[in-house]
UniProtKB/Swiss-Prot annotation:
Disease the record associates with this protein: Asthma-related traits 5: Asthma-related traits include clinical symptoms of asthma, such as coughing, wheezing, dyspnea, bronchial hyperresponsiveness as assessed by methacholine challenge test, serum IgE levels, atopy and atopic dermatitis.
Gene3D superfamilies assigned: Death Domain, Fas, Phosphorylase Kinase, domain 1, Transferase(Phosphotransferase) domain 1
Protein name: Interleukin-1 receptor-associated kinase 3
GO molecular function annotation: ATP binding; magnesium ion binding; protein heterodimerization activity; protein homodimerization activity; protein kinase binding; protein serine/threonine kinase activity
Tissue: Expressed in eosinophils, dendritic cells and/or monocytes (at protein level). Expressed predominantly in peripheral blood lymphocytes.
Result for mutant: V134M: Probable risk factor for ASRT5
Organism encoding this protein: Homo sapiens
Span of the signal peptide: none
Chief localisation class: cytoplasm
Source lineage: Eukaryota, Metazoa, Chordata, Craniata, Vertebrata
Subcellular location: Cytoplasm; Nucleus
Domain remark in the UniProt entry: The nucleotide binding domain binds ATP with low affinity.
Length: 596
């Protein structure tokens, strides 16, 4: 659990129901069990149970003489619910006596019982949340003028700057927010106005408004969008943020408005910044924060392309117990982010810190490819499914063709590591996904490989063909030709080949294969003399004739070692050549080539 809250006055709105003191739990159960109808345990069950079948199970416990309220709260507590969640339900029930028990037990939850008797639904919840003490951090109590966070912004400035929220200043809209742009004191801000069109929907979405406000007030990080101010004036609830001129990461990846594509060094910087923010939220005390809505559209970029994580309406708190997850009810708002959510969330509503890791893995894939999460062609396939299928069937190199073509290519080592990391983050099983600590370390170590001009070849298959200019200047560069032409050497190269074939000491070559060469039968002294007089040369000059060009699918140079095919007076003598490359040699491929 998050901590021991047995002492009076140690409760807060974030205290888990598991940590509810036994004495308080007993009093609460006695009050609710003694009431009938909407104020009793049945009224509580109507709001906590997902189906009437669950209510029937509670009735069986009651028939056995057990407390229906205790069973309800125990089941609800397994979803990581807090005292603040319980207070909201009790307020909906209108159960002032139960609220009085909780608020009198932990005075820090509310300044007085009067706060639950005045005003409407939003005002009650706002006062309830605005006086919370978590980890010795006090959220200041709001007033009619709202809260100013190191800012001189007033609500009148908002009204005048937006002309009373005129549509001309509307720059975005979501399910529960409208976003306006406003100029105040030569500074630009974004105003998120809470929608209150319908009373029932207002009550439904109010908790999401509080969730975002709570996270922004309690937790601060350079890569989390800071809150400039918030107001609750005349039933207008709004959050004020600094305006991010470079928009969202999604818009920049898609080059919306014909903007220039992001170079690779900015992209890796964005990934590192967001991973730091997520890592901070997952490890913050007293309980970790699950974002629940990580996407490229929820990552904002400032003037210097520094990333800012935003949108915490779906955020949930959980204790730091290992392998713990909570179950939530999916809403229509979360369905917009389903492409970023793992299967355990879509099917069962399970939410954990590994959910954020999965979502971040999808963002990495977007950054690498510049593609949308769902590809229109072919057949609206998910980007994640396409890349993982390629990795499993054709290997990691097959994904490199999906790198964003709008920017110059990056080193293979850099992109391969990021594709591998994205695949691990977006694993189907949550246990196989890395922690954000591991993700952050991998990103920081990968950043250094971006500044290497190219990757050193590890085998002949990774060796790049030289340019034509290089071929003209170096006559000994191999040239491609058929096997049948290997014995028809050019006159100018015949002597050079004979000299090199008579060298006694083995060469050091970059090839991974071990070759056997036929040597001319000559007196030992003559061979030694020729070997000493021959000048040193590179491995390419030593092994390949002039007319063989290395390709990406280069096979071993075949040399006839059959004694019967040698000229009279020569014997077949073989010796291996040392290799400086540690890559594996495909014997199956060599045998197949030999048969041809």
């Amino acid at each position: 659990m998050a901590g021991n809250c047995g002492a009076r006055g140690a409760l807060s709105a974030h205290t888990l129901l598991f940590d509810l003191p036994p004495a308080l739990l007993g009093e609460l159960c006695a009050v609710l069990d003694s009431c009938d109808g909407a104020l009793g345990w049945r009224g509580l069950a109507e709001r906590l149970s997902s189906s009437w079948l669950d209510v029937r199970h509670i009735e069986k416990y009651v028939d056995q003489g057990k407390s229906g309220t205790r069973e309800l709260l125990w089941s609800w507590a397994q979803k990581n619910k807090t005292i603040g969640d319980l207070l909201q339900v009790l307020q909906e029930m209108g159960h002032r006596r139960a609220i009085h028990l909780i608020t009198n037990y932990g005075a820090v939850l509310s300044p007085s019982e009067k706060s639950y008797q005045e005003g409407g639904f939003p005002n009650i919840l706002f006062k309830e949340t605005a006086n919370v003490t978590v980890d010795n951090v006090l959220i200041p109590e709001h007033n009619e003028k709202g809260i100013l966070l190191k800012s001189s912004i007033s609500f009148q400035n908002i009204i005048e700057g937006t002309r009373n929220f005129h549509k001309d200043f509307l720059i975005g809209e979501g399910e529960i927010f409208e976003v306006y742009r406003v100029e105040i004191q030569n500074l630009t801000y974004a105003v998120k106005l809470f929608k209150q069109e319908k009373k029932m929907q207002c009550k439904k979405h109010w908790k999401r408004f509080l969730s975002e406000l709570e996270v922004l007030l309690l937790f601060h990080h350079p890569n989390i969008l800071e809150l400039a101010a918030y107001f609750t004036e005349t039933e207008k609830f709004c959050l004020i943020y600094p305006y991010m001129r470079n928009g969202t990461l999604f818009d920049r990846l898609q080059c919306v408005g014909d903007t220039a594509p992001l170079p690779w060094h900015i992209r890796i910087g964005i990934l590192i910044g967001i991973s730091k923010a997520i890592h901070y939220l997952h490890n913050v005390q007293p309980c970790s924060v699950i974002c629940g809505s990580i996407s490229s559209a929820n990552i904002l970029l400032d003037d210097q392309f520094q990333p800012k994580l935003t949108d915490f309406a779906m955020a949930h708190f959980r204790s730091h117990l290992e392998h713990q997850s909570c179950t939530i009810n999916m809403t229509s708002s979360s369905s917009k982010h389903l492409w970023y959510m793992p299967e355990e969330y879509i099917r069962q509503g399970k939410l954990s810190i590994k959910t954020d890791v999965y979502s971040f893995g999808i963002v990495i894939m977007e950054v690498l490819t510049g593609c949308r999460v769902v590809l229109d062609d072919p057949k609206h396939i998910q980007l994640r499914d396409l890349l993982r299928e390629l990795m499993e069937k054709r290997g990691l190199d097959s994904c490199l063709s999906f790198l964003d073509k709008k920017v110059p290519p990056c080193p293979r080592n850099f992109s391969a590591k990021l594709f591998c990391l994205a695949g691990r983050c977006a694993a189907t099983r949550a246990k196989l996904r890395p922690s954000m600590d591991e993700v952050l370390n991998t990103l920081e170590s990968t950043q250094a490989s971006l500044y290497f001009a190219e990757d050193p070849p590890t085998s002949l298959k990774s060796f790049r063909c030289p340019s034509p200019l290089f071929l003209e200047n170096v006559p000994s560069i191999p040239v491609e030709d058929d096997e049948s032409q290997n014995n028809n050497l050019l006159p100018s190269d015949e002597g050079l080949r004979i000299d090199r074939m008579t060298q006694k000491t083995p060469f050091e070559c970059s090839q991974s294969e071990v070759m056997f060469l036929s040597l001319d039968k000559k007196p030992e002294s003559k061979r030694n003399e020729e070997a000493c007089n021959m000048p040193s040369s590179s491995c390419e000059e030593s092994w390949f004739p002039k007319y063989i060009v290395p390709s990406q699918d280069l096979r071993p140079y075949k040399v006839n070692i059959d004694p019967s095919s040698e000229a009279p007076g020569h014997s077949c003598r073989s010796r291996p050549v040392e290799s400086s490359c540690s890559s594996k040699f495909s014997w199956d491929e060599y045998e197949q080539y030999k048969k041809e």
